[in-house]
């Protein structure tokens, strides 16, 4: 099934619901960064969360950054996503592997440890909005839900998951339910949604059963005046880094540093943290930058 995101409302527009399938982009991240099983799960859950949250940002150029910094062996991770359906991210220590937790699952919480979640929303105009919350469990879903409830003051239920095995990622994605102010006063509705989500064994088992996002929406909200929007948005891993951007960054180092690279290293190499793409600049490239800087100085 193609990576995609759909949206809808329910309960007379009192509930916003967003769902995403991110299997292929999570597998791409796993391959690019050579991620362990537990690192794949941590990054995949965070990428799904970021896509779900950023989908409600109005401007296409808006971006959401989710950074998780814990004291566990994973170190930390950073994800960048936008309402255009693009996402990228990386893990500080991608090779970390841990034994399964007490439930026999990948121990994402143990890999992340205790720490904080930092969120920055850049709306494409004005100043970015940033907030920080303490991690609840390190399992990502709980932590992002806590962020939404405390920083955005929106009662939310988030279910994200990644299934990764010897053949790679075979299921990944999530669903976000947000209760808007007009429905938040209906305690029975809130309790019903919490109960239904609580009965689910996770998000990836639903995909493995062959359910589509439409099916999952119907199962959860079919009796609550569900309205699924007709647009299906494609989502993908996309970094946006280019050789030209790398050259621009090198140019900022100045003439002396560039001349030193030419003399000592015979060129330069840069690796993008977000996608692990490696860019090479040879002596000719660096020499042109030096000439440009000389021309700019006159």
From Swiss-Prot:
Concerning HAMAP family, the annotation shows:
HslO (MF_00117)
Q: Which UniProt keywords apply?
A: Chaperone, Cytoplasm, Disulfide bond, Redox-active center, Stress response, Zinc
Disulfide linkage:
239-241, 272-275
InterPro entries in UniProt: Heat_shock_Hsp33 (IPR000397), Heat_shock_Hsp33_C (IPR016154), Heat_shock_Hsp33_N (IPR016153)
Q: Name one GO cellular component term.
A: cytoplasm
- What is an annotated GO biological process for this record, any one? protein refolding
PANTHER family from the UniProt entry? 33 KDA CHAPERONIN
Q: Where in the cell is it found?
A: Cytoplasm
| Gene Ontology molecular-function annotations | protein folding chaperone; unfolded protein binding
- What taxonomic classification does the UniProt entry list for its organism? Bacteria, Bacillati, Cyanobacteriota, Cyanophyceae, Oscillatoriophycideae
Domain of life where this protein originates: Bacteria
- Function summary: Redox regulated molecular chaperone. Protects both thermally unfolding and oxidatively damaged proteins from irreversible aggregation. Plays an important role in the bacterial defense system toward oxidative stress.
In what way is this protein post-translationally modified? Under oxidizing conditions two disulfide bonds are formed involving the reactive cysteines. Under reducing conditions zinc is bound to the reactive cysteines and the protein is inactive.
User: One Pfam family name from the record?
Assistant: HSP33
Entry's family note: Belongs to the HSP33 family.
Protein name, per record: 33 kDa chaperonin
């Amino acid at each position: 099934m193609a990576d995609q995101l759909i949206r809808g409302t329910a309960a007379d527009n009192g509930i916003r619901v967003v769902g995403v399938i991110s299997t292929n982009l999570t597998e791409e991240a796993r391959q690019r960064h050579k991620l362990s099983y537990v690192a794949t799960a941590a990054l995949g859950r965070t990428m799904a969360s970021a896509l779900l949250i950023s989908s409600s940002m109005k401007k296409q150029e808006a971006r959401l950054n989710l950074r998780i910094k814990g004291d566990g062996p994973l170190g930390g991770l950073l994800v960048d996503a936008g309402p255009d359906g693009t996402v990228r991210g990386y893990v500080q220590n991608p090779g970390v592997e841990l034994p399964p937790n007490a439930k026999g699952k990948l121990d994402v919480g143990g890999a992340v440890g205790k720490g904080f979640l930092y969120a920055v929303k850049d709306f494409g105009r004005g100043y970015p909005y940033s907030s920080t919350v303490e991690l609840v469990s390190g399992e990502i879903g709980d932590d992002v839900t806590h962020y939404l409830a405390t920083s955005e003051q929106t009662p939310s239920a988030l279910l994200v998951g990644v299934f990764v095995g010897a053949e790679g990622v075979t299921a990944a994605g999530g669903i976000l339910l947000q209760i808007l102010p007009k429905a938040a006063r209906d305690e029975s509705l809130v309790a019903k949604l919490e109960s239904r989500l609580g009965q689910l064994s996770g998000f990836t088992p639903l995909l493995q059963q062959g359910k589509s996002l439409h099916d999952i929406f119907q199962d959860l909200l079919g009796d609550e005046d569900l309205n699924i929007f007709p647009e299906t948005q494609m989502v993908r891993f996309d970094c946006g880094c280019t050789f030209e951007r790398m050259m621009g960054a090198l140019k900022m180092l100045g003439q002396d540093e560039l001349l030193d690279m030419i003399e000592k290293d015979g060129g330069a190499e840069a690796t993008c943290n977000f996608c692990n793409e490696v860019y090479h600049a040879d002596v000719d490239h660096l020499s042109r930058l030096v000439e440009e800087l000389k021309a700019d100085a006159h």
